[in-house]
Each structure stands twice: as C-alpha cells, then as structure tokens.
Amino acid sequence: MPSIITHAAVPLALWCAADRGRIPAWLLGPGVVAAMLPDADVLAFALHIPYADAFGHRGASHSLLFAGVLAVLAAVWAFFGSGRPWSAVSCQPRLAPATARPTVASTVQAAVFVFICAASHPLLDAMTSGGLGVALAWPWSEHRFFAPWRPIRVSPFAPQFFSARGLATLLSELRWGWLPL
C-alpha cells in the first residue's frame, strides 16, 4: 500500500488544482479523511482477521461500495450539517446566516469529491508491488484486483516505515504518486 501520506495527497492535489473556490475549504478535511479511512482496516490484524478475509486488510473498506457509502454520508452531512464547523450551508464556515439553505449543488459536490477521494485509495493500493490486491467489487465479488501497471513499492507497516525500506517507498511514491499529481 502507499503510505497514508500519499493517500492524503490526492484530495490536496485536487483541491489545489481546482479553480479557486470550486472545491470549498470546508470540504478538504472530509476528503482527506475519506482518502485515508480505508486503511483503518489494519485493525483487522489486531483482531486476528486474516488478510485474505473480506474484512481483512484491503478488503471491504477498499471497495467502491465503501467509497459510495462515504459519499452518501458526506452528502447527508453537507445537507443537514448546518451549525457544524464545515457545513455546506452556502459553502461557508459557520458564518453563514441562519436562514441560508444548503444547495443541491453543494450536497452533490460533497458526495462527488468524497467519492473520488475515497475511491483513489484502493486505486493507488492496486498500483503497488505487493500484497493481495484490493477488493474493489466487494460485496459482489471477493476477488482482489491489481492494476496491470504496479510501479509503487508497497509500504512497510510501522515501525519498519522508518527504515531504508520506508525511505525507498517514499521515493517511489514521490515519483509515481506525487509528481504526476
């Protein structure tokens, strides 16, 4: 898998590349969380869930369905989240007047951005040189997919991340992940 740092780079790159204001600042945080969240499945190792299990590492949380669920949650949060620090009400932080209504555009925008951010995670993981692949089509298929081109070195888990192998992984991610962004 690429490191968690590289997964966070995708929403940051999208936000920076978009026309100013196209992706509001309040949406950046949820996008970064959505891009990193699938790797919370490493907790499966501590729970003795086998790697190859549907709920193991790179399993269900790396599916497009999971990205879709996060997108729906983002849309609901954007629509009903007035009064929250990053509410979609008029695409403004808490400064929006109480009479402002969330727009359909801001709700759809939240869903699309969060979906792209969450879906980027398994797509990047599928481009790595190791592991069992990603369960993109879960729950319809438990098949693990790899991209036909896999230039990114698989990231070691901590504490091995802070080693020569971890540095080689970061350089690989810089070359194949960050620079193209």
Predicted regions and their residues:
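N-terminal membrane-targeting hydrophobic helices
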Residues: M1-L181
